[in-house]
């Protein structure tokens, strides 16, 4: 007698009903008719476990989007590698989306308004990548009055200023910096 036992399985086919996600628990996340998901930075607060409403941190909560090394900048969409994603900021192609060893996003949430994320099947206008598209939009409204802000936490600082120049012209300046080079960390 052999020490190995053979087991045979009989297939059983079971059909499940489809599940359609119509809304999310958090405001500002919407599924669009073109298959993309919209993240509105201005309409929502940070997700649980996040310090701020960062686009890349929030995107990792969506189905099909992960990161293998727990960094913000190495996002994988539907199993593709990070270099197979197209990341745009106001139509400008970005190749590096993080700093502090990829742990922090380069996008200041105070000047980003929303992001449109395609998890495969993006429009031909986005060509050039095979995994997914993250199309981030910045502030487009002319500020009504001068305002600004500063944010500090244990790993980074960010600041922004929004100033109207006229009725139809204004400017927005934003900066974000990690503390990696202070104290010999970088």
Report residues per predicted region.
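Short, acidic, small-residue-rich periplasmic hinge/interaction motif at the N-terminus
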Residues: 2-48, 56, 82
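A beta-strand signature from Gram-negative outer-membrane beta-barrel systems
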Residues: 7, 62, 106-147, 160
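Transmembrane beta-barrel domains of outer membrane proteins
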Residues: 10, 58, 78, 118, ...
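Transmembrane beta-barrel strands of outer-membrane/channel proteins
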Residues: 23, 148-154, 173-179
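Short acidic/polar hinge/loop motifs at secondary-structure boundaries
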Residues: 46-48, 92-119
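Extracytoplasmic beta-strand/coil segments of soluble accessory domains associated
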Residues: 47, 56-93
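Residues that define the transmembrane beta-barrel architecture of outer-membrane proteins
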Residues: 53, 128-130, 153-157
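Periplasmic-side early beta-strands and strand-to-turn transitions of outer-membrane beta-barrels
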Residues: 143-144, 164-186
């Amino acid at each position: 007698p052999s020490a190995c036992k053979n087991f045979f399985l009989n297939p059983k086919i079971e059909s499940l009903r489809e599940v359609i996600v119509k809304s999310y628990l958090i405001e500002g996340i919407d599924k669009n008719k073109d298959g993309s998901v919209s993240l509105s930075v201005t309409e929502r607060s940070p997700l649980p476990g996040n310090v701020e409403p960062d686009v890349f941190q929030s995107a990792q909560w969506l189905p099909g989007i992960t990161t293998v090394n727990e960094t913000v900048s190495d996002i994988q969409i539907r199993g593709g590698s990070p270099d197979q994603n197209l990341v745009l900021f106001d139509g400008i192609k970005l190749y590096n989306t993080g700093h502090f060893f990829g742990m922090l996003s380069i996008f200041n949430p105070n000047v980003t308004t929303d992001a449109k994320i395609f998890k495969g099947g993006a429009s031909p206008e986005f060509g050039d990548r095979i995994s997914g598209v993250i199309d981030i939009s910045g502030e487009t409204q002319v500020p009504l009055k001068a305002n600004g802000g500063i944010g500090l936490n244990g790993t980074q600082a960010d600041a922004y200023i929004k100033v109207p120049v006229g009725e139809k012209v204004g400017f927005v300046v934003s900066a974000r910096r990690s503390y990696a080079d202070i104290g010999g960390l970088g």
